[in-house]
Amino acid sequence: MNKVRHFIDTQDLSKKEIFEIFRLMKMLKEARYCGAVPELLKNKTLAMIFEEPSTRTRVSFEAAMTLLGGHAQYLKPGELHLGVRESLYDTTKVLSHMCDGIMCRALKHETVLNLAKYADVPVLNGLTDYNHPTQAICDVFTMLEYMPATKNLEYEDIKFEDIKVVFIGDRTNVCSSTMHITTKLGMNFVHISPKRYQSPQEWVDIANENIKQANSGSVLVTDDLEQVKDADIVYTDLWWWVDQEDEAEERVKAFKPTYQVTPELMKKAGQQALFMHCLPASRNVEVYDEVIDSDQSIAFEQAENRLTAQMGLLVYYLYPQIDKSSNAVKDYYRGKVEAFMEHQDRSWKQRYTYNNDYAETKNKK
């Protein structure tokens, strides 16, 4: 068996590896459209740990495992108390012995890091308070699939230095992941937000190191909406989450109306700009209906590619770990078990016949 690899952060991947995942995603998407997805994970099980619920993450991973011939087991919020009733180490070891992979949507990034530390099977990061790498893989794949300048090119032929991605709104985990994967590929990333909600310097430092390694791209954090001009992608996210409900009023005052994605803002970006949103969206809050439902929006194509991304990531990380037994070995164990059960069946029938005969004899007496 190969050394176990985990998917925790796109920073752990090289540019070449990202392209490999994209190519795999493209093949599997084409196969799904043809109704011909190969069952590469047949009879395999993915444990899905959710510390908070999610529609797209759960449905996409479950559907992906089903299409690939496997099974996804949903461990819902409150059903599995990591590190409470049982240590995280013990839980991880048990899941490693019963399942072929673990996906975790965690409240704290440390949880996923520790899962990966203890696991003997691949761990996939379904979201933490720090990042959302499965979303990032999906998003860049979608950008390159739909931008006119890139959709017909091989990934190595794309001029990433000419691509500008503008993220408007709060410094969410999606913002973090988008900043880091785009700069790793050498794109230009801009985060536009009120100063209080801007990306922290440590995120920018990582982006700058990515730019240095890629030898192209740029990163800018600003409150200046003029920087949306000439954007290829305009991206936004929710302004607050469930655990930030007490801040909702304050956040609305900070973002509305200046940082709403409106038709006027998209016009300022330019007709080439495509709109993206990781969803769920608060319509007419961070984005107007007229934008998310417009021809410039690829938000729902982006959502579909969550399934594409999960298929690609599951195959990329789980398939190399599978013990690929020959048909001869499979036939051997099938025959061995069937022979055992046939013997048990005969023994059961003999006991059943003996008991019936004994009962009939006793009744006659």
From Swiss-Prot:
Q: What is this protein called?
A: Putrescine carbamoyltransferase
Pathway per its UniProt entry is: Amine and polyamine biosynthesis; putrescine biosynthesis via agmatine pathway; putrescine from N-carbamoylputrescine (transferase route): step 1/1
Residues under site feature: Important for structural integrity: 29, 145
List the lineage, top down: Bacteria, Bacillati, Mycoplasmatota, Mollicutes, Mycoplasmataceae
Q: Which GO terms describe its cellular component?
A: cytoplasm
Functional description taken from the UniProt entry: Catalyzes the phosphorolysis of N-carbamoylputrescine to form carbamoyl phosphate and putrescine. Is involved in the degradation pathway of the polyamine agmatine.
Native organism: Mycoplasma capricolum subsp. capricolum (strain California kid / ATCC 27343 / NCTC 10154)
Q: What does the record give as EC number?
A: 2.1.3.6
Keyword Transferase on this protein? yes
BP GO terms, sorted:
arginine biosynthetic process via ornithine; citrulline biosynthetic process; putrescine biosynthetic process from arginine via N-carbamoylputrescine
